[in-house]
Amino acid sequence: MTALWRDPAKKETGYPAKWTYDHGLVLKGIERVWEKSRDKRYFDFIQRNMDHFVADDGSIRTYTIDEYNIDHILPGRALLFLYKTTRQEKYKKAAALLREQLETHPRTSQGGFWHKKIYPSQMWLDGLYMGEPFYAEYAATFNEPAAFDDIAKQFVLMERNSRDDKTGLLYHGWDESRQQRWANPQTGRSPNFWGRAMGWFAMALVDTIDHFPKQHPKRAKLIAILDRLAHAVTKYQDPQSGLWYQVMDKGTAKGNYLESSAACMFVYALAKGVRNGYLPSRYKAVAKKGYNGILKEFIKRDSNGQLNLEGTVNVGGLGGNPYRDGSYEYYLSEKVVTNDPKGVGALLLAATEMEIASKRR
């Protein structure tokens, strides 16, 4: 595991000095491996990673609340895991600090969280995974029933403002102000359907529904959003490889390529959705086909015998400096790398779900 993610106990050069979302995704994947294996090394790895950042008073090294970056909420899921497992107060205090951010985080006029303070009036698909599973788990753990209406609202707004009626796919971002160059002046939507952005949204749904009270009136809305998403994702699955393209609706257009992190995210969301009864059983075959494609196309053994995950786009965003215009050409311009944490974390989640599925025949 340390070949793919730095171990803080070893003080290795290159260990992330900042509290980051990809860090949180990898740890969530390792948590699922620990739950399956109960190998203490995985638990210790998660705890060492969090202790690298969290002080005894619950403060988080390098985290500043007034950046209002929704990405910074995601690693808090490891804090909730550690608190529930160890009952150490420092993890509860640190999680409460992240929960406090959500109280004052800037919002659109409709009540949707901005992606970041530096991206005003914008909601991105990515942000739903960054914030809502933590928000829902925190609310369930510490008895905040009123929070669930707000959590459901984030998904309803994101789908309403980004879903394309023709394809069923969701545009990467939405700008309420229509001020960004990437935003459609009529709708505020960005121009393309990015695979990993939809993967983040899919994972956000299944992980959030897990914590929703079964009798909550908005739970059925979230399941309906997931079902619509699963239908669209299935429609754009490549029939030969079982994978999905970087720009989902462009298929074999010049420069487009099959991308690994989105595939891992879709496989996880579909398989888990079926297992937990959120999705019809027919999606199990879609997940299996996708997983077989991942194993065939993206898992490669190097000369040292180590398995690697290839084919992950390094990053994707909108606006900023240098400016990302959301064009087809932009999404194809980002580097494709090996063992990117966003791919590795999603692969661990997908693999554990598919292992569970294989034993439930």
Question: Regions from the language model: what does each represent?
Answer:
Residues 126-141:
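Acidic/serine-rich, low-complexity amphipathic helices located in mid- to C-terminal regulatory regions
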Residues 1-10, 44-61, 93-112, 145-181, ...:
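Long, well-ordered core segments of solenoidal/helical folds
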Residues 1-18, 26-28, 57-62, 128-130, ...:
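His/Met- and acidic-residue-enriched segments that coordinate or traffic transition-metal cofactors
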Residues 202-251, 255:
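Oxyanion-binding "anion nests"
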